[in-house]
């Protein structure tokens, strides 16, 4: 009898493993009136999404420059890593949404002239669409944002601009925007900024320099978001991330800051992703 039970369990293992697998869809789209085009996105649905009626927390996971909504799927291996974290209990079951910010114009922000309004699209159209389409808990405590490089910059600015919407933010190897006004010179050479006025440039700096935004954060916002900043010791963006950490320390903004061995590549970010999922899950739980 014991041998029969053992054999049955062995035969059932592939079925059990299959049942514990989430799903990824990486070529979905929604129509944007703000951007006047269809915008693609990818989504990870946890293993029990199709067999339950429950709603889930959500992570908005932002890609870097040169990638699109498929980056975290193809290179970041979100399906394998999220499934493993959920199965092992280091992360709670969640939905992961990965928007495209590489089509039309690259980036997560409104451009300086205001004729490309990605940030407005994200908050006014994309988030409401996603959270109405999927079974997502629509409260701040169940919503987080993370991203790498350009997406790390988006993570910083989105959570700084909307601390009422995100419980946690986890920028990886983040592009921290112009670090000072002199640094703005390299930004003005970008498309759409060549003819910007001095006032437009100064306004852009104040709204997109992460160290400057941290420096000017109101006291009542300093504990609204749980922060975790992660950057490799061989990453060319180490300076900006270190300066942000220093400003946060000076201004009494609670956060975690890690410099680990590694560079600006997918090997580093795949290693970071389980930590991201665990950290944001702490906020999703009651604590």
Residue ranges and their predicted role:
Residues 4-16:
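Sec-dependent N-terminal signal peptides
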Residues 20-287:
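Non-catalytic cap/lid and distal C-terminal segments of serine-dependent acyl enzymes
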